[in-house]
């Protein structure tokens, strides 16, 4: 199973992590405990209530969710419409 998403803000990050957690049928408390965070902190992240979230904490949550961090140039991913145009109208 491949899971790819693009995020540019901390609220988008929280939403993406929540989606992945739910996809894996994990509870916030499980992910929080395994990553060394409080459930309240993970909840605030998932609900877009944080303005900062440390790299170590992020790496711990990603590990629990079976994810890794990848960097892409802004705009390099393109859109579905751009992909369709490149492929002659089908995607």
Q: Language model features by range: what are they?
A:
Residues 36-51:
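Recognition helix of helix-turn-helix/homeodomain-like DNA-binding domains
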Residues 12-13, 27, 35-37, 66, ...:
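Hydrophobic/basic alpha-helical segments enriched in Actinobacteria
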Residues 55-71:
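DNA major-groove recognition helix of helix-turn-helix/homeodomain DNA-binding modules
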Residues 70-91:
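Short, charged recognition helix plus adjacent turn
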Residues 15-32, 89-91:
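Short basic helix-loop element that most often maps to the first helix and adjoining turn
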Residues 9, 41-44, 58-61:
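Residue-level recognition of specific faces of alpha-helices
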Residues 1-23:
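A short, Lys/Arg-rich alpha-helix, primarily the initiator
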């Amino acid at each position: 199973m491949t899971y790819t998403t693009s995020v540019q803000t901390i609220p988008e990050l929280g939403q993406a992590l929540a989606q992945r957690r739910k996809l894996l049928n994990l509870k916030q408390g499980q992910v929080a405990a395994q990553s060394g965070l409080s459930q309240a902190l993970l909840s605030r992240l998932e609900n877009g209530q944080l303005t900062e979230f440390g790299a170590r904490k992020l790496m711990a949550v990603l590990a629990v969710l079976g994810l890794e961090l990848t960097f892409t140039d802004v705009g390099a991913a393109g859109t579905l419409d751009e992909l369709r145009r490149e492929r002659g109208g089908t995607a």
